[in-house]
Amino acid sequence: MKNICLLGATGSIGEQTLDVLRAHQDQFQLVSMSFGRNIDKAVPMIEVFQPKFVSVGDLDTYHKLKQMSFSFECQIGLGEEGLIEAAVMEEVDIVVNALLGSVGLIPTLKAIEQKKTIALANKETLVTAGHIVKEHAKKYDVPLLPVDSEHSAIFQALQGEQAKNIERLIITASGGSFRDKTREELESVTVEDALKHPNWSMGAKITIDSATMMNKGLEVIEAHWLFDIPYEQIDVVLHKESIIHSMVEFHDKSVIAQLGTPDMRVPIQYALTYPDRLPLPDAKRLELWEIGSLHFEKADFDRFRCLQFAFESGKIGGTMPTVLNAANEVAVAAFLAGKIPFLAIEDCIEKALTRHQLLKKPSLADIQEVDKDTRGYVNSILT
């Protein structure tokens, strides 16, 4: 029996993680969890899984949950301290970080210090502080297991292989909601249009990131840290069907790919069961004859400027990826709120990157300060 801490339970990854736990109740137990403000969604989860500790995102939600009575004993935590408390509980074996944004960084570091296995779905943790997280994981001998479908695919393709034999990583991208639209057409797209992802069921922020290709850019930076691969050896290819989740090319030019129908429960479950595999009820079998053909295109930096920003920020390193991520989070929130048009997301990010004075080897405090400063700057140009 593995004891699980789930940070970000009411998000898309969180819900699908609970699907996996529900399917294997003899293998997993949820001992702690967190959510932000969605108490209507969280309460049924709490009643079903009966965690010992629940952390919430704000004081109002904290008071509401405190007033509720459950049939079991459950402690309530708040904010970052609550996230940390949930992650470092003595009983916890695996911390699933499904939080949205850079809020996932500190709880991850604290969990690593307590030698908890990390199942990482929170891209921003490695994007903003990859060097610190990797050093921490190495120091405490803690595995970082990828939950993203692309990184899980690479991780699976590398089983039994030696890192020295890798030629390049090939990360696939669906292209998002607007993959067939021209730059001119993108000027007038709506929030509703952007949230219609053709292949995956995801939360609002990541669906917008998919439409701008920032999601793929963040995944490139994450792959760099997870697999210790230079950016020059990471490629992105557009693949509309989302059947090949990513590939690894070796020095002899052979390529190993991981395939499957689009279902986030599969990489989530693999991270939880690694190195074993379990059956996954209701998972759809891949029948290639039904699909008939797969399509691929080269990713165009002129068409997807956020992807270019991510590659450039990653190569520069230091605090630049922190700026990239913070500016993107604020700009996407503004787009979702109807405050700016879709293409203005790129403009906000570019202005923040151009303005930034690079710190090459930032401390954790430096990263937090740059994150705060960038958010303040982008908010100021939006008002």
Curated annotation (Swiss-Prot):
Gene Ontology biological process: isopentenyl diphosphate biosynthetic process, methylerythritol 4-phosphate pathway involved in terpenoid biosynthetic process
NCBIfam families to which the protein is assigned, alphabetical: Dxr, PRK12464.1
PANTHER family: 1-DEOXY-D-XYLULOSE 5-PHOSPHATE REDUCTOISOMERASE, 1-DEOXY-D-XYLULOSE 5-PHOSPHATE REDUCTOISOMERASE, CHLOROPLASTIC
Keywords: Isoprene biosynthesis, Manganese, Metal-binding, NADP, Oxidoreductase
Cross-referenced InterPro entries: DXP_reductoisomerase, DXP_reductoisomerase_C, DXP_reductoisomerase_N, DXPR_C, DXPR_C_sf, NAD(P)-bd_dom_sf
EC number(s) from the headed UniProt entry: 1.1.1.267
Residues noted as binding 1-deoxy-D-xylulose 5-phosphate in the record, renumbered to the chain: 123, 149-150, 174, 197, 210, 215-216, 219
Binding-site residues for NADPH, renumbered to this chain: 10-13, 36-38, 122, 124, 203
Its job: Catalyzes the NADPH-dependent rearrangement and reduction of 1-deoxy-D-xylulose-5-phosphate (DXP) to 2-C-methyl-D-erythritol 4-phosphate (MEP).
Positions with a binding annotation for Mn(2+): 148, 150, 219
Cofactors that this protein relies on: Mg(2+); Mn(2+)
Reaction catalyzed: 2-C-methyl-D-erythritol 4-phosphate + NADP(+) = 1-deoxy-D-xylulose 5-phosphate + NADPH + H(+)
Single annotated GO MF: NADPH binding
Name recorded for this polypeptide: 1-deoxy-D-xylulose 5-phosphate reductoisomerase
Family assignment from sequence similarity: Belongs to the DXR family.
Pathway assigned to this chain's UniProt record: Isoprenoid biosynthesis; isopentenyl diphosphate biosynthesis via DXP pathway; isopentenyl diphosphate from 1-deoxy-D-xylulose 5-phosphate: step 1/6
